[in-house]
Every structure is written in structure tokens, then in C-alpha cells.
Amino acid sequence: MLSSNAAAAVADAETETADIRAYLSSQERKTLLRFLTCGSVDDGKSTLIGRLLYDTKLIFEDQLAALEQDSKKHGTNGGEIDFALLVDGLEAERQQGITIDVAYRFFATPKRKFIVADTPGHEQYTRNMATGASTADLAVVLVDARQGVLQQTRRHSIIASLLGIRYIVVAVNKIDLVDFDEQVFAKITADYDAFAKDLGFSSIVAIPMSARHGDNVTRISERTPWYAGPSLIEHLETVDVAGESVAQPFRFPVQYVNRPNLDFRGFAGTIASGSVAVGDEVVVAKSGRRTRVKRIVTYDGDLPSAFEGQAITVVLEDEVEVSRGEILVAPEARPDVADQFTANIVWFDEHPLLPGRMYILRTETDEVSATVSQLKHRVNINNFAHEAAKCLELNAVGVCNLSLQSPIAFDPFGKNRSTGSFILIDRVTNATVGAGMILHPLRRAANIHWQALDVTKESRATLKHQKPAVLWFTGLSGSGKSTVANLLEKKLHAAGRHTYILDGDNVRHGLNRDLGFTEEDRVENIRRVAEVARLMADAGLIVLVSFISPFRAERRMARDLMGEGEFIEVFVDTPFEECAKRDPKGLYARALKGELKNFTGIDSPYEAPENPDLHLHTVGRAPEDMADELETWLRERGYC
Amino acid sequence: MTANLTHLQRLEAESIHIMRGVAANFSKPVMLYSIGKDSSVLLHLAMKAFYPAKPPFPFLHVDTTWKFREMIEFRDRMAAELGFDLLVHINEEGVRDGINPFDHGSNVHTHIMKTVALRQALDKYGFDAAFGGARRDEEKSRAKERVFSFRTASHTWDPKNQRPEMWKIYNTRVAQGESIRVFPLSNWTELDIWQYILQEGIPIVPLYFAKKRPVVNRGGMTIMVDDDRMKLLPGETVEERMVRFRTLGCYPLTGAIDSCAATLEDIVSEMLTARTSERQGRLIDRDEAGSMEKKKREGYF
């Protein structure tokens, strides 16, 4: 028997348990809003987030104690609490008093859960702003009431628009510093609306506020009696960002093929849009094969159907070939499949985007080599003018045509953020250098078919009793590339081999006479020569290419164009001082005097090969000797 | 349509998506298993992500030799029950040199037995991706970290120069010797973790539940006397108190809290009224300003 007290305690505990469960299930049904704060430097983004966390009681005592201590040490408010220090978590940020990288913060009110990305204002860190914007549905654009709309306000708004954000809050901050002047607020609002009218936002809500003092952040301020709208938090709690979303067709990018044993072959992924049920007909986008869904497998049991956002494993009726990078789609609404398309690109890297250079293009699940075949225009951040450009610099935005080595399946980004986006990766550094939003496929890709020929490369080479090869001589101007190549060709020719030399200077007199020495033109120079060398190798020749070819990325691109074992990189390694001393054409003397621009080794870089197939240290060696070495090398490997 | 998913379902799907991406892109991934509540959730998610197969990677526990005894028992039991591939690594040089938290302090101990040990293990097996259970809500420098966080060949993190991370497209490319730390729980909060444990019935180490345990007060923290390697200082006495732990690490460095929360519901309700953050119980975060960022740059998880 329990005493009455104990029974009451048990009953209390049971009520409490039930209460907790009820509370948690109410939490579960809350919607989530992901938003970012952006805008120019010192507009108060971090301070605003600190204020939101503080006012929604999400700061713990130990964190508050640390904040008070930090405010004394690093704060910019003269010992008063500096809310920015709650989010500027990196040592460098606290020392410099700026935000470098995006910070993610989590808070909730009784109505909604929030993930906010606090993004940096400096132009230098635009890529980190884009990172925060890519997963957000709403942007709070801060404007300093004293400064008005600045270049970074515009840049961030354009990037937010390109990345698919449709909901904007213009937070006119530091309104206390302009004496809560309604005219200032009205002017900034009008300026922003005029500038943003073509950016395709569904709503723009302007709110006057002081993040530092809390006016209109979580409660309506008495100091702006002329403002009749909601406080920031009220607006964030109620804004409907799902908006006019219409039912999207089924898209299931295959991430991973799950094959634990011979009896099970499942395709794992997350549904990007639409829904699917057991028995539904689906099409494998790239191959066009049709089949049906047999099972939808999860750890918690099979499902009869599944919808957008769910991570599932699909088993198909038939043994069709499906690999990572494919998309299972609704048969009646298929995505585009193409190897050429037009896209918006935001560039993140110190090295500019160069048309003709090969990058790795990666979608959510697919990966392929790609080049920008045409840079159509760059967007002027201030007035949206389309400007002609030869390259895209760091933080620039432009529209490009891309050409891929093999087709991918995609939707326009405007229809589907998951299947319409991609990143570009540098092939040498592996850095993420750009982000792309696909506009539309280019149909010309579909109309040029490969003409199948009966006489093959092998048959042409066999007739000549040789193996086709491209010997790629790279090195500084005056290093001896052409001298060695010339001697080697004489030897091969004497032995009855069919050869050809593509020489940098000579090709610039004809095929490449329209190209100069800028970085963009150098990339195009190499691309054309590599393509010509490939045709010659296809004809069965041994091709000797003698080009400075200073960039690793282009030599890599040339290597990728040739067949297995056909590309032989020869590094003619002569130190800069030695080349400048030899100076056979008098170019170093002129370049050092500043008469020649973009000269390799002086004001344009030379990236030495890391693993050349042959490495010739020329100092102290006779050219004859090196040509002999190359010939022996080729003979031993059966090229001649 | 995403609105149809509950908050925890969204988080679960996101974490599973990340894990599958790693399995598809890396040649030798590993999951760091620290036995705590976040690791338990990570393990559960991995079981889900690859079902009906087992997770296609091993689980690595870096044992400092100073973990609570109950943690080690729990670890071995879970490995046996779920049948995952468990690797345990101990820095044997550290053991030989007798490194311990009492004589060498938390800084030296953590660096040698945890950070260095982890680097040793990653190098030994040649892992190119390592999952960790860190969450962005835990600490300020973690709030800044990417889901896929790049490490150089010497395991260092450069917080000022992180790769942009757009949408759900993760750049998984690394050169020889370089690696990526992957954090599938980045967007989870402490409350989400407990709620998920409750919803899914995930087993956790009993130390999270309140019980009478032998403790001493030392340096403002309540430390549990877990074995006889802990020598009492003059004036210290062992008392039996109802305590539990919000996070678990090396027992001499992990502070207990006074609590009567003996069930998951109790823990959640205690959390909802908590006025201090969970890392408050971690001695290592307070050693010096920016200490977590510094440790992370050196290769700590």
C-alpha cells in the first residue's frame, strides 16, 4: 500500500511525464524558418542576432558571464554588453571586431523554431555570405540608418535573389542615431524598393530598429510612434515562406547504391521534390529506362509512399542500371538531360573564372568535368547593367554557357533548388571556386552527333609502325624546349617515324594569332593546341608540343583529352636566372625593363609540374644528350 | 511539402543524407564514437542510413584510459549488440609517460591522450573522412564550422579560410593525406538530441541519469571518484550525492550536477529550465580564452 503522500507524488510524476510529452509534441509541430542576416560592414548584423538570443532568453548564465567578461576585453560599447561577441566566435573575429565567417544560431519562440545564419559584411568574405544564404528562405538585410543603401547592401540582395530567396526584411538599424527620424526611414525604404524591384522578391518588409537597444526587435518601440508595422520577431514568426508552392514533379537523386547481399539492391537518397508510392512508374533520367517502384525501405519499416524531404531507399521492379548521379523521376514530367546549358555563376576564388579552363562540376549527387564555353556577361552590382567581360573576378556574378564532358540531368534552378544547382571545384587545389544556378539547357548540344568512322586511331598508327603520343614540353621561355624538341624530331624522323612539332611561337602566327598574353588568352591558347595535338595523335602521329604552358590546370586538361598513356609531360627545368642569362630572343631584357607585360616568371606565374613523366635538368647538359635520353625512353616503352 | 515532416524528421533526414554522401564519396571513412549521448544518436542514425546493410565504415573510440568505467562497459555492450566494427585506439606513448589529468592538468592530458591520439589513429588507418558528433549550438567556434570541414595533411583546421558550402552540395575532394571532418548533427540542439533519444528509445550510458554517486568538490566542480587512481587532496571528503552528468568525458575533468532526474522525461524537463549551458561541466573549455577554437585547429574534434 502506498501512503497517500507517496501516491500523490507518483500521480504528480505521472502528470509531469504526460505534460512533458505533450509539451514536446507541441514543439515537434512547430514550423522552422531558416533566415540570414546580411548587409554591409558595421550595420549591426551580429548585434541583432545577439539581441534576438538575449530577448528570447536563450543565453545561459555561464554564457552571459563570459559575455560580460568579453565585452570588457574586446567590446566596442565601452564596457556595456556587446551582443556581437555572442556570435563572433573566432579569435580573429573578436580581435578585429569583424565577422569573417557565417555563424549558425538556433532559437525558438512559442510559435516557431529558427535557424539564423549571421553572415559577414566585408566584400572579401562574400562567399561566406553566400554559404549562409544558400540554405535560407528569408534574408534580413541590415541598413545603417546613417549610411543608407550601400554597395554591399546591393551585392547581398542580388546574391540572395540569385540563390532563390524570395522574402526580404529591410532592417533599418541604428534608428536611434538619427533621432528616430521617420523621413530617414522613408527615404531608405524608397531607395531599397526602387533598387530591388527587378530582383523578383515576393515581399519586402522594412522595419526601423535599434538592435543595440532593442527597439522593434522583439517588442514595438514607443520611440517610433510613426511606425505601424510588426516587430521583427512578430514578422519572422508569421511570415509564410512556403507561399504559393505548387506541387512539384517527383525527383529522387540517387546518392548511394545499397547492396549488402545478392538479394537486395536499393537506391538510397533524399526526395528533392514531389512524392512517390509503391507501384508508381518512374524513369531513370539519363538512360530513359522505365520501371516501377517495388518497395520504399526504411529502418522503421517499409512505407506505402514518401514525399519531399524524406531520406529513403527505393527498390525497383526491374534490374535496370542506376548509379550515383542518376535521378529517378516522374515519367510525365522529366528533367532536362544535356551536356551544355546556361547558368548564373557567383565566383568565390582569388583566381578568376577563365573561359576554356576545365573545372569539376558537382551537383547534389553527380560529378563531371566542365568548362565555361562562353562568358556571356558580368552583372554590374550597382545598376544591374550587363557588361562584357573576359573573366569573372572574386565575388563577381555573371551569366555563362557551360560545356560538360558528359550530360547531367537537371531542372532550371527557378523550378527546383536541389536539382538546378551546382558548384565548381578547382582541379588542382580542390577549392570550391564558384556556385551555379542553371537557367536553361542549350539545344545545340543535341544536334551535333558524333560521326562514327571506320578507320581508327589504332589502324592509322599500326600502318606507321608506331604508337601515337603527345610529348608535352613545358618550361620557362628560353629553357630549351624547342631546341630539345627539334633535335628529338630529327632523330625520330631519321628512324622513319611520323612526327610533328607544335611550337608556341609558330602557332601564334596562325591558328592563335588573335590571342594575347593575358591569363584568359593563355588558357585558350593551350586549349586550342591541346585539341590540335589530340587530332594529330588520332591521326597516329607522335606529336611534340613545345609550349611554356605555365598553368597546371591547363596541362591537366590536355592530359585528360588524350588517351591512356598518350600524354607524356616533359619538364624542361632551367632556373629563371639561367633563362634570363641565355635570353636567346632578348625577351627577358625587355620584360625586366617593363616593356613586355604578363611575362612568365616575371609578372605572370609559372606553376612547375609536380610529377612530370620526364624531368630534364638542363644546366650543364648538352641538348643532344637530352634528346638521346628522350628517344631511349620512348623506345623502351614501345612508342617507336 | 517539407512542412509535413516534423522537426525531428527533418533533422534525421538531413543527417542521413550527409552520411550517405560520405559513404559514396570517400574511400575510407570512419565514425568517431565517444560513447556520449551525441555519439549514441550518431550511431543510431548510421544504423538507419544504411539499413538493411550495416554502416559501411568502422567506429573508432579514442580511449584516454580515463573514461568512466560505465562508459567502457556500455561501449563494449553496444558493439556486441549492434555488431558494428569497433576500433579502440590508445596513445601508448602517453600511457608509457604516465600522462594523467591530475599531475599534468587538463590541457596537457587532453592534448596528448585525445588530440594527439586521434591524429595517430587517423594516420595509422589512413582515414580520409571522420564523422564527429559536434553540434553548432554547443560552442561559439563550432557555430562557425562547416558540415564538411577540411583538414590539412597535418590535421589542422584553418577557420579563416573554410570552403564555401552551398545548399546540400558538399565538396568531398581531398588530396593525398588530407581529410574531412563531417558533422551530421551540426543543426541539432541539445534539446533535439534528448527529444530524439526519447522518441527513438536510444540506449545511453546510465551516468546521464541521477543516482547516488561518490563525489568530491574540487575547483568548483563536482567530480566523481570513479576508481582509486583519484587521490584525495587535504581537506577533501567523499560524499554520496544524487548527481548526474550532462556531458561525458574523462571522469576527472567532467563535472556532475546535483539532480533527481532519473528518467528521460525528467532530464528533458530539467533541461527546459536549465540556466547554464552543457559545456559548463567541461573543464577543458575554460582553460584559456578561445580554447575550443585552438584545440580544434590542432585537430581536436
From Swiss-Prot, chain B:
EC number annotated for this UniProt entry: 2.7.7.4
Molecular-function GO term, any one: sulfate adenylyltransferase (ATP) activity
Gene3D superfamilies: HUPs
Presence of the UniProt keyword Nucleotide-binding in the record: yes
Database matches in Pfam families: PAPS_reduct
Disulfide bonds: none
Superkingdom as given in the UniProt entry: Bacteria
UniProt key word Ligase: no
Region annotated Disordered, chain positions: 282-301
Top-level EC class: transferase
Gene Ontology process terms (BP): hydrogen sulfide biosynthetic process; sulfate assimilation
Pathway per the UniProt entry: Sulfur metabolism; hydrogen sulfide biosynthesis; sulfite from sulfate: step 1/3
This protein's UniProt keywords: ATP-binding, Nucleotide-binding, Nucleotidyltransferase, Transferase
Catalytic activity field: sulfate + ATP + H(+) = adenosine 5'-phosphosulfate + diphosphate
InterPro entries named among the record's database cross-references: PAPS_reduct_dom, Rossmann-like_a/b/a_fold, SO4_adenylTrfase_ssu, Sulfate_adenylyltrnsfr_sub2
Subunit: Heterodimer composed of CysD, the smaller subunit, and CysN.
Family membership: Belongs to the PAPS reductase family. CysD subfamily.
Protein's job: With CysN forms the ATP sulfurylase (ATPS) that catalyzes the adenylation of sulfate producing adenosine 5'-phosphosulfate (APS) and diphosphate, the first enzymatic step in sulfur assimilation pathway. APS synthesis involves the formation of a high-energy phosphoric-sulfuric acid anhydride bond driven by GTP hydrolysis by CysN coupled to ATP hydrolysis by CysD.
Name of the protein this chain belongs to: Sulfate adenylyltransferase subunit 2
Lineage of the organism: Bacteria, Pseudomonadati, Pseudomonadota, Alphaproteobacteria, Hyphomicrobiales
Gene this protein is translated from: cysD
